[in-house]
Amino acid sequence: MEGKTTMKGLAMLGIGRIGWIEKKIPECGPLDALVRPLALAPCTSDTHTVWAGAIGDRHDMILGHEAVGQIVKVGSLVKRLKVGDKVIVPAITPDWGEEESQRGYPMHSGGMLGGWKFSNFKDGVFSEVFHVNEADANLALLPRDIKPEDAVMLSDMVTTGFHGAELANIKLGDTVCVIGIGPVGLMSVAGANHLGAGRIFAVGSRKHCCDIALEYGATDIINYKNGDIVEQILKATDGKGVDKVVIAGGDVHTFAQAVKMIKPGSDIGNVNYLGEGDNIDIPRSEWGVGMGHKHIHGGLTPGGRVRMEKLASLISTGKLDTSKLITHRFEGLEKVEDALMLMKNKPADLIKPVVRIHYDDEDTLH
């Protein structure tokens, strides 16, 4: 980066259009850091943003929010980090002094979804260099025993999937249904398992995802191609339904299925990015005409350093293997476009693509 003033990145040019652009390298504030990518992963939400226009039109905004990187510059007030450090970059990078952060909702710092900065209202990570606010609070050092490509799954997939299990308030022995077993849903299965769920139903149809769901702790597979998933769940539970539901896929109509399959006094946790539709369906009768104590919780995953450190410890201790999520591997920043198009086109064997970027001075930068 020495002497350079511009960087290239893969950007959303407008709704339905992407391309490579050149931009000025961001300024590094006193609390901030500039980072170069070591591993990147495109997300389904990137495709919602570009091709569905889910958050409105964006022009020349660099995409991407899942990264592991290496610090190339730190601000004068940064204490914990230095140039050359390899770091896990959470998709959610809150401003920790905001009122929402002080109230316990840092993911909404500055306003609803305000902690989600990358590829929302700030250039993302699919570039030669990217900016991270409040580096000490938001960047976690990459443990030496974790590969960058495995750690990049922590940025969003693991934390979001586990948050679905947290939102569903899963307790020991609960019967749980996870709707949607893409990478986030697979991590919701793993999260439910870690929180002590008993029977775990995983709803999906692609064989590879179903096989991996079983490896992460699912006990039953519900294939929506075999009939109504509510009827299948009720039949499998002798008409009782489930204690908790995690929604990690589907659309605005999926909430109706969740409400129909849970018991009174139960919880639904949603971490699915609803890219389309103005309203969600909640069936009046099955919701107990509004009084069924069937609770719906939807939440953006928490961000920040400490959460990344705790999730990384699950990999370091052998309790979570994120490499099972990675089905396609690329080398070089320019390949992030191919990886993004894979997420858009969703071939049957896809779970998650990862792009690894190498540098000659990766182990000597300081």
Swiss-Prot record:
Reaction(s) catalysed by this chain's protein: propan-2-ol + NADP(+) = acetone + NADPH + H(+)
Co-factor binding details: Binds 1 zinc ion per subunit.
List of residues binding NADP(+): 181-184, 204-206, 224, 271-273, 346
GO molecular function: isopropanol dehydrogenase (NADP+) activity; zinc ion binding
Record localization: Cytoplasm
InterPro entries (alphabetical): ADH-like_C, ADH-like_N, ADH_Zn_CS, GroES-like_sf, NAD(P)-bd_dom_sf, PKS_ER
Major site of localization recorded for this protein: cytoplasm
Keyword presence, Signal: no
SUPFAM superfamilies, per database record: GroES-like, NAD(P)-binding Rossmann-fold domains
Enzyme type, top EC level: oxidoreductase
Keywords (A to Z) from UniProt: Cytoplasm, Metal-binding, NADP, Oxidoreductase, Zinc
NADP is among the record's keywords: yes
Gene3D superfamilies for this protein: Medium-chain alcohol dehydrogenases, catalytic domain, NAD(P)-binding Rossmann-like Domain
Cofactor dependence: Zn(2+)
Documented EC number(s): 1.1.1.80
Chain sites annotated for binding Zn(2+): 43, 65-66, 156
GO cellular component term of the entry, any: cytoplasm
Complex formation: Homodimer.
Family label: Belongs to the zinc-containing alcohol dehydrogenase family.
Role summary: Alcohol dehydrogenase with a preference for medium chain secondary alcohols, such as 2-butanol and isopropanol. Has very low activity with primary alcohols, such as ethanol. Under physiological conditions, the enzyme reduces aldehydes and 2-ketones to produce secondary alcohols. Is also active with acetaldehyde and propionaldehyde.
Protein known as: NADP-dependent isopropanol dehydrogenase
Species per Swiss-Prot/TrEMBL record: Entamoeba histolytica (strain ATCC 30459 / HM-1:IMSS / ABRM)
